[in-house]
Amino acid sequence: MGKCSGRCTLVAFCCLQLVAALQRQIFDFLGYQWAPILANFLHIMAVILGIFGTVQYRSRYLILYAAWLVLWVGWNAFIICFYLEVGQLSQDRDFIMTFNTSLHRSWWMENGPGCLVTPVLNSRLALEDHHVISVTGCLLDYPYIEALSSALQIFLALFGFVFACYVSKVFLEEEDSFDFIGGFDSYGYQAPQKTSHLQLQPLYTSG
């Protein structure tokens, strides 16, 4: 029962991670955020690997999944620092999230709750084929939305890491005990015996 509860809990957290990652991937696609798109794709693959390892009792897959979660926590911590401009990080310095391929920002910048977008006509700040907009009235600015989204990812990743370590430890202990007691012999397994189709004939000797 304990093993099942641990596995079921890990699968549930993996499913939550998958839903949160897909939701985030959609909004990053809408905002042309290529660096987060790549990271989200790798994260989705790792979560699927974690689900497969949990269902199929593969401890190695869970170890890889747990190792990825460490990197995932670090990435999301960087995103929080980036959008909140912690230290030397600044959103106006460069466009890290788009690999410097476009001037797009987060999709939430223009589509946040309560945001009112007003085009600025004849602005000298506008580059070629671009326009300047003014965003006002937002109930929550987009840097805080992105930071909250990353904080949610960190929360799920920490719980997933703990349960992945626990379940993989259970799997490894079961594998060790299985090898120690002789594999299939403990379950009454017997190898099939070869049957002979030769018929024995009586041997007569003359006295």
Swiss-Prot record:
Keyword Zinc found: no
GO terms for cellular component: plasma membrane
Primary subcellular site in the record, as a coarse category: membrane
GO molecular function, one term: ATPase binding
Superkingdom of origin organism: Eukaryota
Pfam families, alphabetized: NKAIN
Entry's transmembrane regions: 2-22, 35-55, 62-82, 147-167
Keywords, ordered alphabetically: Cell membrane, Glycoprotein, Membrane, Transmembrane, Transmembrane helix
Quaternary assembly: Interacts with ATP1B1 C-terminus.
Designated name of the protein: Sodium/potassium-transporting ATPase subunit beta-1-interacting protein 1
Organism (species): Mus musculus (Mouse)
Gene that specifies this protein: Nkain1
